[in-house]
């Protein structure tokens, strides 16, 4: 998830966005481009004391789908989509 992502300045955020756009313009998927840039940022800030874990994947392991929705909320599969088909 967002484990170990450091706080970035506005300028660093802009540079990251530009790199993501560059990778995408070269044919890389948005997900791959984001993952690559995030890995680069994590590596660059590896010993940065501000880079602290925000979420760890195991934080979500003990929860089930019903923990994240109301009991009266219909499943997405049960909702008729007028645009489908």
UniProtKB/Swiss-Prot annotation:
Basic and acidic residues: bias regions: 55-72
Pfam families: UPF0181 (PF03701)
NCBIfam families the record matches: PRK05114.1 (NF003476)
Family assignment from sequence similarity: Belongs to the UPF0181 family.
Annotated Acidic residues bias: 73-85
Top-level lineage group: Bacteria
Protein name: UPF0181 protein YPO1774/y2534/YP_1619
Stretch list, region Disordered: 50-85
């Amino acid at each position: 998830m967002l484990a170990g992502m450091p706080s970035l300045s506005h300028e660093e955020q802009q540079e990251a966005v530009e790199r993501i756009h560059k990778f995408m313009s070269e044919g890389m998927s948005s997900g791959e481009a984001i993952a690559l840039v995030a890995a680069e940022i994590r590596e660059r800030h590896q010993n940065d004391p501000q880079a602290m874990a925000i979420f760890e994947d195991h934080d979500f392991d003990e929860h089930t789908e019903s923990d994240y929705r109301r009991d009266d909320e219909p499943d997405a599969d049960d909702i008729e989509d007028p645009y489908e088909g």
